[in-house]
């Protein structure tokens, strides 16, 4: 049984996105090795991580660039849980309305993208003064 837990704390700066992506994908490759279809899964995970991390920078920490972003990864066998912790005011998910295609709006697709690409998406407001976005998925074995 494979089990790993790791975390990374980075500044609220989009220039750190590639560092966070490399940390995530490298950690998963070290733990899961050749059993996963990396070209397909890395694109999926990169997109979800970019969406979640950039939302923290642009929204939660918009006026507070000195606050850190904490990213946690739990891996058990091929099940992954990725948590992104922020210090923002939070977002009431009850008020979220997915964008309608005919509306042609430019933003608001992040939650939709993340929930389509991951098996489970959960958001918790104000745990010890922080918010946590949890993204979970089972990575399929390489065919």
Residue ranges and their predicted role:
Residues 28-50, 103-105:
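Conserved short strand/loop->alpha-helix "switch" segment adjacent to the catalytic nucleotide/phosphoryl-transfer site
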Residues 52, 56:
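Hydrophobic residues in the alpha-helical elements that line and stabilize the ATP-binding pocket
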Residues 17, 38-42, 46, 66, ...:
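Short, structured helix-loop boundary elements
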């Amino acid at each position: 049984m494979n089990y790993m837990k790791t975390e990374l704390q980075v500044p609220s700066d989009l220039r750190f996105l590639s560092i966070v992506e490399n940390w995530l994908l490298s950690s998963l490759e070290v733990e899961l090795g050749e059993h996963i279809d990396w070209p397909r899964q890395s694109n999926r995970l990169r997109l979800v991580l970019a969406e979640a991390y950039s939302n923290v920078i642009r929204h939660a920490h918009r006026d507070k660039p000195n606050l850190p972003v904490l990213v946690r990864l739990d891996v058990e066998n091929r099940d992954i849980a990725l948590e992104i912790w922020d210090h923002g005011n939070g977002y009431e998910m009850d008020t979220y309305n997915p964008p309608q295609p005919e509306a042609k709006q430019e933003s608001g697709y992040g939650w939709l993208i993340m929930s389509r690409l991951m098996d489970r998406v959960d958001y918790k407001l104000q745990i010890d003064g922080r918010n946590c976005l949890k993204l979970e998925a089972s990575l399929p074995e390489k065919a």
